[in-house]
Amino acid sequence: FKGGTALRRCPLGEYRFSEDLDFTLLNDDDFDTVTKAFDEVTAGVAQETGMAFSYRGPDRVSHENSHTFYMGFTGPMGRPREFKVDVTRTECIVADLERQPVIVTYPVFDFPGDCAVKVYSIDEIVAEKLLALTDPKRTQPRDLFDVWTLATDGGFGLDRLAYPIAQKLRGARKIYLQLSIRKKRRWRRHGELGWMPRCRLHRNSKPCSAR
């Protein structure tokens, strides 16, 4: 578990709301296996709480190193709602994962008090957010807000991030090298087409009339 929701529900408590759920797979797996696992979890949630969730579909934008999809549910006013789930497939995790209790913010409608999940350490989360700020494809104000808040109010020292950022950059290089090799193989397969008949352009042919 990582990202803004992890910050709010595990180490920090009263924090900004996050619109999505972010995870990292400890062992890479395919899209169908991940969504099936979420279906099993949401079935258990529905049995315990009566609140039904369902898989809505993949993100319209394809992602090379993550499984991104939407889960739907019915809100308190009977209106359909959905939230995004982003599951990173391969990630260089530098610090040890921490098993932390989920902070109860709504005593009546929240998780049981003994619920705990594996979460990224604060160092790991902030390092990822700093790296995200350098990515032109993913420049979000919330990442800057999180870094600023943790560095000021949270008493977090940015000098602690040199090592995890360096390790993550090395890990990212290996990951993207693997992705580029995968892309080259994919393009090679597309280029290895069998024999195809020649196409001849008939300029004077009349179009077929549809009935």
Feature map (PLM): residue ranges:
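Short gly/ser-rich loop at a beta-strand->alpha-helix junction or flexible surface loop bordering the NTP-binding
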Residues: 1-11
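Structured mid-to-C-terminal alpha-helical surface segments
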Residues: 9-21, 25-211
